[in-house]
């Protein structure tokens, strides 16, 4: 469980922002959303493969030279 100690004279907004940043770094929200509903193993493999293809395509596009701008 993640805990945040609120410092003396620290506004609530700042403490809440620190808490949100910590949760985001740990990846808890994405993990909870992924586990919210059961996903069949075949659907999980299909989703991961599609993400890998997308990443690969994006990497290849980044390595290509830009088209002439004229």
UniProtKB/Swiss-Prot annotation:
InterPro entries: Ribosomal_bS21, Ribosomal_bS21_CS, Ribosomal_bS21_sf. It comes from the Bacteria. Coiled coil: none annotated. One of its GO terms (cellular component) is ribosome. Gene3D superfamilies: Ribosomal protein S8. One of its GO terms (molecular function) is structural constituent of ribosome. It holds the Pfam family Ribosomal_S21. PROSITE patterns: RIBOSOMAL_S21. The keyword Repressor does not apply. Keywords: Ribonucleoprotein, Ribosomal protein. Transmembrane segments: none annotated. One of its GO terms (biological process) is translation. Belongs to the bacterial ribosomal protein bS21 family. NCBIfam families: S21p. This is Small ribosomal subunit protein bS21. The lineage of its organism: Bacteria, Pseudomonadati, Pseudomonadota, Betaproteobacteria, Burkholderiales.
